[in-house]
Structure formats: structure tokens, C-alpha cells
């Protein structure tokens, strides 16, 4: 029996490679989002610590109050920057997810096509084998007669 060779095997492997590449990109984006969320949490803690540093005192200088206001503004700007970065990463992740969905569909199509070609191959091989068996049987019958 002949060996089955799928004529689109190289294309299928390339599609698998692209699919794995996109999966890796998505996981890297997830890691970056987690990192940004961690930065956001630490920034929130820093904001609270900054606010609480003044609340325990009974006497506060105006310069300290102005300084704390500037610190709060700066922390707010950093928070906005991190939030916009997270939104941007989520947007990129969404596009990558759509690409992954498309690549998965393409991969599945090629797998289905391979199964169909394999079934056709088996059918042809069975027909060839049946012809050989019939030939052997007719030769054996001809010798006996």
C-alpha cells in the first residue's frame, strides 16, 4: 500500500505556525495588561499614601498643601496614561483575537480537507488492492482449470 501524502501539508504547517505566533502575541499582550494593572494598583496605593500623609497632622503649611496638590495631579496624569495604555492593549488584543479566530477556521478547513483527501486515498487504495486480489484469484482459477 502506498504512503499517504497530503499535497497541502506545507500550507497547513504554515497556517499552524501563524496560529501559534498569534497565540503567543495574545499571551504577551495579556502579560503586559497584567503589568499595567499592577502599576495602576501601585499608583493608587501611592495616591492614598500621599493623601494620608497630610491627614494625620493638625498644622499644614500652604507650600506642603500645594506640593501635595501637584503630586496628586502628577499621579492623576500617570493614572490616565496607564489607563490609555491598557485600553490600547485591549484593542490590540481584540484584533489579535479576531485574527486568531480566522487562523483557527483556516486550520480547521485544512484539517477537514486532509481528512477528505485521506478518505479518497483509502478508497483508491482499496480499489487497487481489490483489483490485485481479483487478478490473483482469476490467475489461480485459470491454472486450476
What residues fall within each predicted segment?
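Charge-rich amphipathic alpha-helical interaction elements
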Residues: 1-145
Amino acid at each position: 500500500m502506498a504512503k499517504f501524502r497530503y499535497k497541502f501539508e506545507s500550507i497547513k504547517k504554515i497556517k499552524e505556525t501563524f496560529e501559534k505566533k498569534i497565540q503567543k502575541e495574545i499571551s504577551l499582550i495579556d502579560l503586559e495588561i497584567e503589568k499595567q494593572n499592577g502599576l495602576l494598583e501601585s499608583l493608587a496605593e501611592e495616591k492614598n499614601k500621599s493623601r494620608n500623609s497630610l491627614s494625620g497632622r493638625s498644622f499644614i503649611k500652604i507650600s506642603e498643601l500645594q506640593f501635595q496638590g501637584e503630586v496628586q495631579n502628577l499621579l492623576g496624569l500617570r493614572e490616565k496614561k496607564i489607563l490609555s495604555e491598557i485600553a490600547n492593549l485591549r484593542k490590540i488584543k481584540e484584533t489579535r483575537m479576531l485574527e486568531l479566530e480566522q487562523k483557527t477556521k483556516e486550520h480547521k478547513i485544512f484539517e477537514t480537507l486532509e481528512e477528505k483527501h485521506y478518505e479518497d486515498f483509502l478508497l483508491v487504495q482499496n480499489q487497487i488492492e481489490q483489483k490485485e486480489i481479483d487478478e490473483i484469484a482469476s490467475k489461480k482459477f485459470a491454472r486450476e482449470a
